[in-house]
Amino acid sequence: MESMDAKIVLLGAQGVGKTCFVTRYVNNKFQAGQASTIGASFSRKRVVVNDTTVRLQIWDTAGQERFRSMAPIYYRSASCGILCYDVTSRASFDAMHLWLLELKQNLSSDIIIHIVGTKVDLVKDEPSLREVPFEQCVEYASEWLQDDSCCHEISAKDDEGVEEVFEVIITKLLDKREADEQQKHNSQRQRQSVVYLHTDEDEQKSSCC
C-alpha cells in the first residue's frame, strides 16, 4: 500500500473555533469553551483512500496578535492551508485576509487553500446573527485564490461539514501528487530521448592533441 504525508495548517483570528474544528475531525469530540491555543497545537490523523494511506499532520495555530510572528514557524512546508472565520463575526472574516497574504508570501504558489466558515449552528438557531453571507466567501475566493479553491461552512458542535472539508482536501492532495509524479516521469523520458548530434568535424576536433 502506498503512503503520503501531508501537513495542513489552520489559520484565523482568535475565537473562530479552529481547535474545536480539529478536535471534531481528529477525535470526533466537541469541547465547548476550550482555552485559546498558545503558539500552536499539533494533531495527527491517518486516513486510507483507495490504496493509499494518508498521514495528516494538522497544525492549529494561535490567532492572537502576539503570536502572529511565530506563525511562519508552524506553517512552513505546509501542503494545505485552511483559513477559518466565524460566520457571526465580520471582523474575523476581514482579519482572514492577513493570513492569506502571509501564506502567499511565505509558501509556494501551488499550495492548496480552503476557506472555512465556522459556527453555522448559531445562525441556524438565529439567522440574524449571521454577518458573513456564504456568497461573500465564494466571491472572495474567486478573487484571491486559485480556481479549485473551496469555501465551506461547518459546525463542529453539530458535526456538520467537518469531514467533507478534509475529504476534498485529501482528494486534491492525492491528485496533485499524481500530477507531480507524472510530470517528473515525463521530464525523465524527455531527457532520456535527447540525442546529441555531431559532425565528423566535431569528432576530429574533439580528438585533436
Swiss-Prot record:
Compartment annotation: Cell membrane
Binding residues annotated for GTP, in chain numbering: 12-19, 60-64, 118-121
PROSITE patterns in the cross-refs: RAB
Pfam families from the UniProt entry: Ras (PF00071)
Lipidation (S-geranylgeranyl cysteine): 208-209
Xref: CDD domains: Rab
Keyword line: Cell membrane, GTP-binding, Lipoprotein, Membrane, Nucleotide-binding, Prenylation, Protein transport, Transport
GO biological process, one term: intracellular protein transport
Primary location class: membrane
SUPFAM superfamilies linked: P-loop containing nucleoside triphosphate hydrolases
Its membrane topology: Lipid-anchor
Keyword hit for Lipid metabolism: no
Entry's Gene Ontology cellular component terms: early endosome; endomembrane system; plasma membrane
GO MF: GTP binding; GTPase activity
Motif mapping: Effector region: 34-42
PANTHER family, per the entry: PTHR47978
Biological role: Protein transport. Probably involved in vesicular traffic.
Family: Belongs to the small GTPase superfamily. Rab family.
Protein name: Ras-like GTP-binding protein RYL2
Organism: Yarrowia lipolytica (strain CLIB 122 / E 150)
